[in-house]
From Swiss-Prot:
Gene name as annotated: Cdk8
Organism for this UniProt entry: Drosophila melanogaster
Protein name: Cyclin-dependent kinase 8
Low complexity composition bias: residue spans: 373-400, 424-454
InterPro entries attached to this UniProt entry: CDK, Kinase-like_dom_sf, Prot_kinase_dom, Protein_kinase_ATP_BS, Ser/Thr_kinase_AS
Main location: nucleus
EC number, UniProt record: 2.7.11.22, 2.7.11.23
Amino acid sequence: MDYDFKMKTQIERTKVEDLFNYEGCKVGRGTYGHVYKAKWKETSDGKEYALKQIDGTGLSMSACREIALLRELKHQNVITLIRVFLSHNDRKVFLLIDYAEHDLWHIIKFHRAAKATKKQVVVPRGMVKSLLYQILDGIHYLHSNWVLHRDLKPANILVMGDGNERGRVKIADMGFARLFNAPLKPLADLDPVVVTFWYRAPELLLGARHYTKAIDIWAIGCIFAELLTSEPIFHCRQEDIKTSNPYHHDQLDRIFNVMGFPQDKDWEDIKKMPEHHTLTKDFKRSTYSTCSLAKYMERHKIKPDSKAFHLLQKLLLMDPNKRITSEQAMQDQYFQEEPQPTQDVFAGCPIPYPKREFLTDDDQEDKSDNKRQQQQQQQQQQQQQQQQQQQQQQQQQQQQMNAEPNAKRVRLSGAGNQQDFHHQQQQQQQQQQQQQQQQQQMMFNQQQNFQRFN
């Protein structure tokens, strides 16, 4: 390309920083880049936008895919791509999209945190219904246009704040989305592992090669259950590490602990799954004989005879061929009973959820990630030290018992001394239980933060 022409084009090209104020207004980081809250410089209407800066140098395949899809997709419940900015100096790419003040990850987190203060814990029932209906509406539009989202999770379900589209759901992050208008081509050959583990359908975990729209429906079922209970239904401790092997033992174990082990009559094609042999080798049906979705939801005060449970059951059928479609789900009786779903999921009520916080330093989030990793390493080291100390104490106690058996008998012969000994044992057991509970809570919080950014 002629150098003079290149320089002239570069000067004439519209720059994102010339049109928008966004410096110091970073609001988050997604899978593919940073997100900024932006406003037009030349207008005073106060309308807010989101600028998604794609990581890397230039256009990656995932960025090209997201741009190509968003330019074609137009629906009220799918995020709108307004404009694309290319910076040739530093090879940065910016997507100008709708700005949503909230998302389901933060909304559910807000209600889960309320448990500590004994306030209202669950998301209001009417709001759950409105959220679910709009998610289904958006996914029905995608599926009708031969698009699989493939990475549905609470962090990718945005909710608009105050404004013209108040309380409207926007499905975002189309970087994993795929066209499936050529069903003979194995989609698994492109990306063997997609969708965050907690929301991944069982057929994906068993290596299905020709998966369908049903994977998005399963993820919606997981989100629905999480909205009803404020807890991820298939929470798994193991970190989400992208690999070429789709099989994930711990995630399958978690699903079976909630749903029970699938019966052959309920999922006839399970024997055709590539990882079926591994499944039969690793799991026993009898282990999960007392597990069921009804029991799990009943523990969270969702009755098995409720219409909400009946719809959830259809969304979370193990057999993808029997799983309900988005169109069928929208016609379910759950949406016919009061309260009816509303366009504003907040139903005109004040919004209780805090607005997104600014990250004034561009590297602040990366630093927080490093800090979190350092904290995790320190906690692991502390745990190892505690375990070593406990082992040393046990060894010392064992040596004392072996060296002084007679003295031990004398010390324990008195009633008062025996009570002191038992009291010490109880204190040690209580301390160990407290440490275990703290470790479990710490691991859960780490998983929540990890799942949000992946």
